Curated annotation (Swiss-Prot):
It is an enzyme of class 2 (transferase). The gene is coaD. This is Phosphopantetheine adenylyltransferase. SUPFAM superfamilies: Nucleotidylyl transferase. Pfam families: CTP_transf_like. HAMAP family: PPAT_bact. Substrate binds at T11, K43, T75, R89.
Length: 168
């Protein structure tokens, strides 16, 4: 499967060590992995698009075959315009599979030439979700195991700014 480009889309809000694990595994399979950072109108976002792109670039700075792009478009439109025919998705559990199965059928309708490659999450990350991470943040829990250091630093800055704002 080498000599191929693939896209790995997501909101990455926040970027987790589970995402990093999938990125590391993807670059072993594909020559180039384009990480697409998107907005999700259904989710309350902790970080804006630019911040999320910065986190990914910083956390993956030592990987040569990665490109990080932010989009406000359908992933299938981006893939078609750039002649990319492989989409990577992580599957943590049976619920993810159900959602990804439906999304794959929609993507196939929108861009029939694109194939979805599902990567099963390592057991260490199979339970992790952005909702769980946001709850840990809200209650001040330890994030060291779950998030890259650059993301933790920015979360602490955001919390500090919010506390200062609330004091004024």
């Amino acid at each position: 499967m080498k000599n191929k480009k693939a896209i790995f889309p997501g909101t990455f809000d926040p970027l987790t060590n589970g995402h990093i694990n999938l990125i590391e595994r993807s670059i072993k399979v594909f020559d180039k992995v384009i990480i697409i950072v998107a907005n999700n109108f259904k989710k309350n976002q902790l970080f804006n698009l630019k911040e999320r792109m910065h986190h990914i670039k910083k956390a993956t700075k030592n990987y040569k075959n990665i490109k990080v792009i932010g989009i406000n478009d359908l992933t299938t439109n981006f893939a078609r315009k750039n002649n990319i025919k492989i989409l990577i998705r992580g599957i943590r559990n049976i619920f993810d599979f159900e959602n990804e199965f439906i999304m794959e059928k929609t993507n196939k309708y929108l861009y029939p030439e694109m194939e979805s490659i599902f990567m099963i999450s390592d057991i260490n990350w199979s339970y992790m979700s952005s909702s769980m991470i946001k709850e840990i943040i809200f209650y001040g829990g330890n994030l060291d195991y779950f998030l890259p250091e650059c993301v933790i630093k920015d979360i602490k800055k955001k919390i500090k700014r919010k506390i200062v704002r609330n004091l004024n």
